[in-house]
Structures are given as structure tokens and as C-alpha cells.
Amino acid sequence: MSLRANYYFKPKSLEEAYSKLKEDPKNSIVAGGLWMKRMGLQHNCLIDLSEANLNYIKEDKEFVHVGAMTTLREFETSPITSILFGGVIAFGISEVVGPAFRNIATIGGSIFGRYPFSDVITSLLPLDVKLIFYPKQEMSLEEYLNFKGKVDGILQEIIIKKENGKAFFKKVKTTALDFPLINFMVVKRNDKYFIAVGSRPMAATLAHKAMEIMNKTGNIEEAAEEATKELQFLDSFNISKEYRMDLTKVYVRRGLEEVSK
């Protein structure tokens, strides 16, 4: 499959990009373009953000600021982001296909698509993450995943709050370069537990009831069992619903044990 469009536009600013985007409902933003290419849809105008100054990783005292056009490989290897939560966030992102793919795929495109197989979303969801959309909208990553419909704006920046804590990431896959059969991220930050499960095969979500059990009682077995009950799981051609549930109980328990040490 290939990207099909009548026009190609490379703006120098977000203002230019947004103006072009609003001209026609069939105009589309292209970041890395890898998933768009697989979809094989017809677009009127593809708007390439590669020259809109959105490729950066910066930090201040409290936050890490990541431009939406930063590649997954850059996020994985940056001295700023590679050390977050002991390097576990970068490890989760390093599990996306192979290095050649991560040199093209962007952090913004990976989030904006809300892909059900995303290792990126699962890795970031348990953190305090804010998304900045041009021209004027902000929301947490969880709010965006639950947002109905399409956000009126362009994803500009991902802001990650710096916090002390521990993390555990696990991707279950058939071969090294496969999409996940299911993936997990367990984080303990500010003495609170956060559990994300993705590729069920739906976009990652937080297991709020399991988190509540851990935060109130610290009962790991009960929390792991609750995660299998509160989340929805489905069959797919290479893994059953029941096996996904079994894996969830095992790896949520292991994750909670790891971050509790």
C-alpha cells in the first residue's frame, strides 16, 4: 500500500499547517506516515510537519517536553528521556518493531492514532502525561484515549512530569519484531500504583479498580485478579481472550511485585 494524495504541503509553522488542515476535511497531517501508508486511504492534501520545528526533547526542573515529530528512536536514546523511571519507558518504546522503523515513526503519530497495538501508549499511560494540541487544547493522555471523535487541532507536544518511581514493562509477542499480543506497564510513583494493559486487542487503558485495591490494601494477588475482571478482552486470530486474561493476571502480579521492591 502507499500514501495517496492529490497534493503535498510542507509548512514551516503550525499556523500554516493548521490553516491548511481546516481547508478540507480530506486534508491530513502526516508525521512518520508509516501507519497511514498501511491504511491505504485517499487524501486530498498531505501536510508534512517535518519542517514545523516539532522535533525536540527538552527539560526543565519539573517536566520533560517532547515535540510531536520526535522519532521513537530519538526518544529511546536521548539522555533526557532514556533515564526516566530507570530507563523502563525507553525500553518499552524500544520494543516497537525494529530500529529502522523507530527512526521514522514519531512519538506524536504513535499517540495521535490511538492504535490498539501501541507499545508507546501503554508505556506512557501510567505516567503524568499531558498532550498539547495546537491551537488551544490540552488534555491528559488518558483523557485523549477516552475522547470521543477527533480532536480539533494538531498534536504539538507531549509533556511528561518528572517523578521518582519504579516501572515494569512487558510485551508478549510471537517473534522479536511482531506487534504485541498484549502488553503491560506497571508504575509506582509518589507511593501510588498505576497499571496499564494494552493490545487486548484494544487501545491501552488503566485498570482503575486494580489500582484502587493496591493503593488501599497492597494486596497484589487481589489486584492482579481484579485487572482480569474489570478490563475487556477479545479473541484474535493468534491468541484467545482467555489466554490474554491469564497473561494479564501473571504479568500484572509480576509488575506489582517488581515495583514494590
Predicted regions and their residues:
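C-terminal structural segment of proteins
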Residues: M1-K261
